[in-house]
Amino acid sequence: MFKVIHRYVGPASLSLLTFKVYASSKKDSPHKDTVKVNELSLYSVPEHQSKYVEEPRTQLEESISHLRHYCEPYTSWCQEKYSQNKPKIQSLVQWGLDSYEYLQNAPPGFFPRLGVIGFAGVVGLVLARGSKIKKLVYPPGFMGFAASLYYPQQAIVFVQVSGEKLYDWGLRGYIVVEDLWKENFQKSGNVKNSPGNK
């Protein structure tokens, strides 16, 4: 083991200078008893064993615990609804971003057409004064008519799909009415044809 005899402190630029270091050899040093690392007091292991004791809860901790247990069903319900609605919300946001991008790079003549279609809706609303059914039918009808003038191919596809859906709904309604008719009015028909009424 080397022992440094001369120390020098100076600026960092002077650290590149060379100088001599005098050290004593192992033969000159007196023999010392070596100490193992685990014998040092720094590394000594305490002999007593510690035991974990949980501190008693305070009133604030108890009230927070009760509040968490009370709110847990509601938070789990909210998380479930959020996970169910997250894809729908993301698709709605994506649709909004796509619409915004389309409106930023709109084809020529799009905004005048949109203005005419909107004006047709306002005219339908003005002509529908008085009746609630007219207010529900006239504005979309006028807007649909104006849109079909500018976009005839899309209007044809829309009418075909809407016609099929309306036919299906009408057929379902007819079946429901027929079932109700058979249940309610055939029973009363049997009373008229009973032998006591002849």
Swiss-Prot record:
Primary place of residence?
A: mitochondrion
Describe its function: Component of the MICOS complex, a large protein complex of the mitochondrial inner membrane that plays crucial roles in the maintenance of crista junctions, inner membrane architecture, and formation of contact sites to the outer membrane. Plays a crucial role in crista junction formation and mitochondrial function. Can induce cardiac lipotoxicity by enhancing mitochondrial respiration and fatty acid metabolism in cardiac myoblasts. Promotes cholesterol efflux from macrophage cells. Detected in HDL, LDL and VLDL.
**Which processes are annotated in GO (biological process)?**
cristae formation; lipid transport
Keyword field contains Glycoprotein? yes
Q: Which keywords label this protein?
A: Endoplasmic reticulum, Glycoprotein, Golgi apparatus, HDL, LDL, Lipid transport, Membrane, Mitochondrion, Mitochondrion inner membrane, Proteoglycan, Secreted, Signal, Transmembrane, Transmembrane helix, Transport, VLDL
Q: Where are the transmembrane segments?
A: 108-128
Subunit = Component of the mitochondrial contact site and cristae organizing system (MICOS) complex, composed of at least MICOS10/MIC10, CHCHD3/MIC19, CHCHD6/MIC25, APOOL/MIC27, IMMT/MIC60, APOO/MIC23/MIC26 and MICOS13/MIC13. This complex was also known under the names MINOS or MitOS complex. The MICOS complex associates with mitochondrial outer membrane proteins SAMM50, MTX1 and MTX2 (together described as components of the mitochondrial outer membrane sorting assembly machinery (SAM) complex) and DNAJC11, mitochondrial inner membrane protein TMEM11 and with HSPA9.
Q: Name one Pfam family in it.
A: ApoO
How is it placed in the membrane, per its record?
A: Single-pass membrane protein
Q: Where in the cell is it found?
A: Mitochondrion inner membrane; Secreted; Mitochondrion; Endoplasmic reticulum membrane
Query: In its keyword annotation, does this UniProt entry include Ribosomal protein?
Result: no
Source species: Bos taurus
- Family statement drawn from the similarity comment of this UniProt entry: Belongs to the apolipoprotein O/MICOS complex subunit Mic27 family.
**Name of this chain's protein:** MICOS complex subunit MIC26
Q: Which residues are glycosylated?
A: S162
